[in-house]
């Protein structure tokens, strides 16, 4: 989804063929892409919102971050010790590195979305598995945009944290 152009008007099949031709993906990667699942997502409400954000230049993909968090903050997010790769830089600070799949800015806040392909049976299972990660990523975005304002002049904050399960074909609020 990193290269997908939501506002192009092209079908997923056409876009995947173009990505292969432009060497953005390999033939092996193309073989793993399930076109109907991509089409379903792109035509969903969230996919359409992403298209609108893309048109206005406010869709951001694969954004890396490195940020320090206190142990208390990590505990509040639900991170237990050894649940992810963390680097302790001092007694008070742990350095977290991550890559945000996609986020976009709407008139009243930031929407954070993480794509998932896990084999799960329920939304709850996926939500519980990734809640801490999305809280942490949301806080990272809040810090990055702490001096920005939304269209109403309010501080720009993450307003929605979402997972999209390709397996379940669902957007899951977290």
What are these regions, as identified by a protein language model?
Residues 1-85, 89:
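A non-catalytic, helix-rich entry segment at domain boundaries
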């Amino acid at each position: 989804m990193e290269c997908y152009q939501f506002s192009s008007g092209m079908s997923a099949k056409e876009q995947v063929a173009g990505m292969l031709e432009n060497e953005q993906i390999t033939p092996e990667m193309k073989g793993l892409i399930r076109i109907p699942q991509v089409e379903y997502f792109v035509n969903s409400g969230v996919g359409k919102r992403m298209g609108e954000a893309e048109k206005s230049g406010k869709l951001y993909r694969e954004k890396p971050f490195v940020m320090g968090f206190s142990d208390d903050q990590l505990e509040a997010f639900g991170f237990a010790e050894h649940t992810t790769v963390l680097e302790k830089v001092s007694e008070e600070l742990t350095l977290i590195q991550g890559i945000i799949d996609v986020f976009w800015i709407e008139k009243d806040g930031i929407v954070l979305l993480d794509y998932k392909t896990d084999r799960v049976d329920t939304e709850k299972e996926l939500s519980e598995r990734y809640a801490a990660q999305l809280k942490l990523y949301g806080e990272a975005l809040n810090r990055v945009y702490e001096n920005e304002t939304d269209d109403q002049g309010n501080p720009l904050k993450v307003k929605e944290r979402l997972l999209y399960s390709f397996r379940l074909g669902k957007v899951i609020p977290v």
